[in-house]
């Protein structure tokens, strides 16, 4: 389609924090060009389509990069259609931009393969203007990193103790620092 919904990610707003995509999603031009106004001097409410589009891009970029490194269908990656290559489908990342359920944070909930992973990206108030975590590649890749490590260790349920959760934070920081510094 011509919206921020694809095989790897469903990127959308979730302003009311109900975990249901706020629609309509950003729409591209007939040539699938998603070109929206953005100014870092403006409040996040003024560039929502740009924010969701960037979140869609980052999620697809990290999906493809990690796929090339072995996080494929049979390893439990996040895809709606696995094209007969193993693993369970119907689990594209649900990427909630400007999620209304929190502030000053982001998170990634990772159930087992075949169930939807959920990335929640929040607004960081207090500055002038407020900041949108969907536009920060380090945060998006870090959160996606939780999805990767949670799927690879214990099939979505293996990183729950304090020590393993601490390791998960370190791995996610490593993904962001190493992949975005290339």
Q: For the regions a protein language model found, what residue spans apply to each?
A:
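Extracellular zinc-dependent metalloprotease catalytic-domain scaffold
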Residues: 1-182
